[in-house]
Amino acid sequence: MFSTLKNAFKDKEIRNKIYFTLFILLLYRIGANITVPGINVKAITQVAQTGLVPMLDTVSGGGLDNYSIFSLGVSPYITAQIVIQLLQMDIVPTLVEWGKQGEVGRRKTNQVTRYLTLVVAFVQSIGITLGFNALTQMGLVKNQTPQTYVEIAIIMTAGTMLLTWLGDEITDKGLGNGVSVIIFAGIIARLPSGLYQIYKEEIINNSASDRWQGILFFIAVIVAILIVTQLVTWVEQADRRIPIQYTRRATISGSESFLPLKVNVSGVIPVIFASSFIVTPATILMAFQRTQGDQQWFKVMNQIFSLQTTPGVIIYTLLIILFTFFYAFVQVNPEKLAENLQKQGAYIPSVWPGKDTQDYVSKMLIKLSTVGSIFLGLVALLPQLATNFWNLPSSIGLGGTSLLIVIGVVLELSRQINGLLMKREYVGFIR
């Protein structure tokens, strides 16, 4: 990894991409510390450690702990993406048609996603402001008028749209997927405070007689992080190599060709999607906290969309598994893959080209996604269950989710840099 970075900084184009990405992240971190006007910052500390705030911060990359202009982060954009991609599955004919139009269709889809992001962000802004205001005994918003709530929602929505645009700029001119990189940066920024929270609760606040137990627990947390990091890295890099043969040429070198399919084809996207799927309804529910908090329907919905309850954690895990299968077929389209192999005169041994190849790849994706989804689900589930059962700090509960995102983004950045370096070497060799 370090040698890759060293070589990357020697190349001017890659170096500029790194600097551009860091510059955008600097702008993001500055915005994450600018509090929305009209908000009582002291009041937000009362709810800063509730289950929703750390979760929303994790999935959005925002700065909800100080109610910044980037409080919602990219969460509304992720929610909009989920909705649009689901509607493209033979539900809305227009969206399905756009999916087949290549770059032109992609631009149209992105435009609709932006419009939907505006709506989701505005609704979430109203919901979360009303909810947090109720939780802080009406102390969050200084001037509690409808106009003030609308103004706050407009500012937070504008922050989301700006952050989404910055993410697109990273994707186009920097390194990695912009949205994932922003979420990654938010998690990294909170990492020191998360570790300090564990250190404070388990060591500093413990009595002298129990302090050794806190020290052992803190060491155990560090060891667990290292072990999970290694496991996630191994699974993220593991792949199934399907042998490929060509009818139109002979392999002079004697080397075999492979079609590599990752064990976790979807990467960290299922975790981000599942988190957003839980957080979005939870933020909207907060708007009804004060008026409907005692109603049965509210209690049921609050159980479902909360990671502090066992049903909520189970649903969250099932969503990760579901999105893993769904996004695997988005990342690798068996029909297009079979078509491209046939055009190149390539085939899988013992498998007929065309429909048989498509079915074979689909079955392989299902098998790989089964392993990948169970692994992702367990990494996200176990720390959260431990937190709920033993009343551990919330940073531990979200540790699995955070690790999955951080490691996934780091590996993706490493792969992209290596790809750019190989491209430079290849171009230099041709010249």
Swiss-Prot record:
InterPro entries in alphabetical order: SecY, SecY/SEC61-alpha, SecY_CS, SecY_dom_sf
Keywords: Cell membrane, Membrane, Plasmid, Protein transport, Translocation, Transmembrane, Transmembrane helix, Transport
Superkingdom to which the source organism belongs: Bacteria
UniProt keyword Glycosyltransferase present: no
One of the protein's GO biological processes: intracellular protein transmembrane transport
Places the protein is found: Cell membrane
GO cellular component terms, A-Z: plasma membrane
Pfam families hit by this protein: SecY (PF00344)
Membrane topology: Multi-pass membrane protein
SUPFAM superfamilies: Preprotein translocase SecY subunit
Transmembrane region(s): 18-38, 67-87, 115-135, 150-170, 178-198, 215-235, 268-288, 312-332, 365-385, 392-412
Family recorded in the similarity comment: Belongs to the SecY/SEC61-alpha family.
Role, per record: The central subunit of the protein translocation channel SecYEG. Consists of two halves formed by TMs 1-5 and 6-10. These two domains form a lateral gate at the front which open onto the bilayer between TMs 2 and 7, and are clamped together by SecE at the back. The channel is closed by both a pore ring composed of hydrophobic SecY resides and a short helix (helix 2A) on the extracellular side of the membrane which forms a plug. The plug probably moves laterally to allow the channel to open. The ring and the pore may move independently.
Record text on subunit structure and interactions: Component of the Sec protein translocase complex. Heterotrimer consisting of SecY, SecE and SecG subunits. The heterotrimers can form oligomers, although 1 heterotrimer is thought to be able to translocate proteins. Interacts with the ribosome. Interacts with SecDF, and other proteins may be involved. Interacts with SecA.
Matching HAMAP family: SecY (MF_01465)
Protein name: Protein translocase subunit SecY 1
